[in-house]
Amino acid sequence: MERPLRIGIIAGELSGDTLGEGFIKAVKQQYPDAEFVGIGGPKMIAQGCESLFDMEELAVMGLVEVLGRLPRLLKVKAQLVKYFTENPPDVFIGIDAPDFNLRVELDLKNAGIKTVHYVSPSVWAWRQKRIFKIEAATNLVLAFLPFEKAFYDKFNVPCEFIGHTLADAIPLQSDKASAREILGLEQDKQWLSVLPGSRGSELKMLSQPFIETCKKLHQKFPDIGFVVALVNQKRREQFEQAWKEHAPELDFKLVDDTARNVITASDAVMLASGTVALECMLLKRPMVVGYRVNAVTAFLAKRLLKTKYVSLPNILADTELVKEYLQDDCTPDNLFDEVSRLLESDNREMLDKFTEMHHWIRKDADQQAANAVLKLIEK
């Protein structure tokens, strides 16, 4: 009797666990008895993935934390490589977590196992030479965005554009009234969503200019409401401190909720750069991007960044569809002018382009990923 399909798979954090879950479901539609083994979180385990280590082992951020965990990470890596070389899967997939997964992939590829890296690192934006590392470690890269594939093609590195899972998850039309109801926001009022980032360093840099922008907006639009999405209690306390300092008289509605509801409920959005800009584009809300980093990071970014723009909607459109105010340009005056313009116009051109781009990257990524991997196995 033919043995079932066997897939090695490692996800290093919660977002990877979600991608792994969708991938496993899609493969099982074609191969119901397929086996998955490696490292997964609760969602992958619920789909039948055997996890050899706790996913938390890999979810370390920041240089100091990584150094502290290095001996353990190296041990886990060695044990995984040993396991997979002794029990070779039909294919191995590393989901994101490139610092860990590319090292595992390199060893396995050298041992004759086909390897796939799911989610391209941002090689197109900075440290482009990493592409040679990726080429050495993988048989295939699965990319979320079309310009990523174009970059790999330039270097003849096998890459498949599978569309973006966010574009699949977000409907083509979003329901503003329902989102307002969920958040308890008045329906007949204009709302600006304020998204100052998810990291402490981002709130440190952006809370003040964003709050002062709201102050100016309130003078011009006395009835406007401000709703702020904050990822956790720490960020909430940080924002409250800045609020008390710079505009205690203003009324902000603070929400410990996903950015998605907050964006959906709004008429316009002022945000820090990041995945949230892509989410805002998919939800078809007019936005302005403001971003500041410390002087050293800014100096390095200027030299290392290879893209004209920092926000994904602009990189995707290859034009400045969304205004980006960075560093010294990220001022209350500039942000105020742009948000005022967004609130006073219908933004038709911007929103039509957002819809067009949503269609570009909405391809059923889970299914596309499964198809690409199964095709590689058959090669």
UniProtKB/Swiss-Prot annotation:
This is Lipid-A-disaccharide synthase. The keyword Glycosyltransferase applies. It catalyses: a lipid X + a UDP-2-N,3-O-bis[(3R)-3-hydroxyacyl]-alpha-D-glucosamine = a lipid A disaccharide + UDP + H(+). Its EC number is 2.4.1.182. Pathway: Bacterial outer membrane biogenesis; LPS lipid A biosynthesis. PANTHER family: LIPID-A-DISACCHARIDE SYNTHASE, LIPID-A-DISACCHARIDE SYNTHASE, MITOCHONDRIAL-RELATED. It comes from Vibrio campbellii (strain ATCC BAA-1116). Belongs to the LpxB family. GO terms for cellular component: membrane. Pfam families: LpxB.
